[in-house]
Amino acid sequence: MIPVFAVGRSQEVMLVLEKLHSEGKLKDMPVYLDGMIWEATALHSAYPEYLNNNLRNKVYQNQDNPFRSEIFNKVESTDMRQEICGREEPAIVLATSGMVNGGPVMEYLRNWAPDFNSTMVFVGYQAAGTMGQRVQQGAKEIHLHDREKGGTIPVKVNMNIETCEGFSGHSDKRQLMRYLRTIRPRPKIVLLNHGDPQKCEQFANDIRRKVRLDCRVPSNLETIRFM
């Protein structure tokens, strides 16, 4: 089971899985796409001009379109989702949401978390306070919504937990610093408003020291005057 965001990260993982399958490095098993992944992927095929050259050419040729590989299967219904949860044969499931805080991934988590033979692979950042972060950090028991009685029920986490680094939708520190050095006209002030507070403060200090720009990390509800 791989928790993913429907746009961007899903397609990156799909390309990796399709490549491994075509090279014979991935066992022959179905890959199920649950949530809005199928619809979001269709947009990538509909507008290949926005993809890199290699992928664009494959999409134009159609028969080589990796997004239309036979290994990918759309989860069409709740009943189909339940069938997948109950199957004994190996399978890979990509499901939203990426931080395991809602969406169809919760149903797979409910069914597979207690299973020693199941594995959850994280391919994206897990924000503080999310279910994804708790599982990633080794929680042995989680509480999930009880659909029948309301409230929550405890669920043991016996499945294997893996984190695959390298997938990122953001520029890294080096790329951001280079951007700030070359942007014209030169900004008068830089605001950092997305990220862990401690890392934002560290990055702001580096910007002030190395790029010589006024950089601030605003708090929630803080007002900053630009004029």
Give the predicted meaning of each segment.
Residues M1-M227:
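Acidic/His-rich, metal-assisted hydrolase cores and their charged scaffolds
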